């Protein structure tokens, strides 16, 4: 068995079930946050502006507008053990794979809903 096959087998065992989502979708990511000896789950909701990588190293970027109208982006590894679950809140219809133009737009941008 070659090293490449071994890596693929290990990657396959690490993968967990995640819902299918694309850039433009609004998702709610439940993240496990460890504070001292306690652990709690924090929800982070926003628009997926990019998905990159493949396999176990796949990541996605979620952007949301926090209090005061400041945009906050967070990059999540898709198969990280700190992610409890991912919910798709609404499906957006966009024509780009990377929605970096949303960084320059002030206020809330309306993304058309996908049926």
Swiss-Prot record:
<comment type="similarity">
    <text>Belongs to the bacterial ribosomal protein bL19 family.</text>
</comment>
<keyword id="KW-0687">Ribonucleoprotein</keyword>
<dbReference type="GO" id="GO:0006412">
    <property type="term" value="P:translation"/>
</dbReference>
<dbReference type="InterPro" id="IPR018257">
    <property type="entry name" value="Ribosomal_bL19_CS"/>
</dbReference>
<dbReference type="Pfam" id="PF01245">
    <property type="entry name" value="Ribosomal_L19"/>
</dbReference>
<protein>
    <recommendedName>
        <fullName>Large ribosomal subunit protein bL19</fullName>
    </recommendedName>
</protein>
<comment type="function">
    <text>This protein is located at the 30S-50S ribosomal subunit interface and may play a role in the structure and function of the aminoacyl-tRNA binding site.</text>
</comment>
<keyword id="KW-0689">Ribosomal protein</keyword>
<dbReference type="GO" id="GO:0022625">
    <property type="term" value="C:cytosolic large ribosomal subunit"/>
</dbReference>
<dbReference type="InterPro" id="IPR008991">
    <property type="entry name" value="Translation_prot_SH3-like_sf"/>
</dbReference>
<dbReference type="InterPro" id="IPR038657">
    <property type="entry name" value="Ribosomal_bL19_sf"/>
</dbReference>
<dbReference type="GO" id="GO:0003735">
    <property type="term" value="F:structural constituent of ribosome"/>
</dbReference>
<dbReference type="InterPro" id="IPR001857">
    <property type="entry name" value="Ribosomal_bL19"/>
</dbReference>
């Amino acid at each position: 068995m070659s090293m490449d096959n071994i890596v693929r087998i290990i990657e396959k065992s690490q993968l967990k079930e995640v819902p299918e989502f694309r850039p433009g979708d609004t998702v709610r990511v439940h993240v496990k946050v460890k504070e001292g000896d306690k652990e709690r789950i924090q929800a982070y909701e926003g628009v997926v502006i990019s998905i990159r990588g493949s396999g176990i190293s796949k990541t996605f970027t979620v952007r949301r507008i926090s209090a005061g109208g400041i945009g906050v982006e967070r990059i999540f590894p898709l198969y990280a053990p700190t992610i409890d679950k991912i919910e798709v809140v609404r499906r957006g219809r966009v024509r780009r794979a990377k929605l970096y133009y949303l960084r320059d737009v002030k206020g809330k941008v309306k993304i058309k809903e996908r049926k």
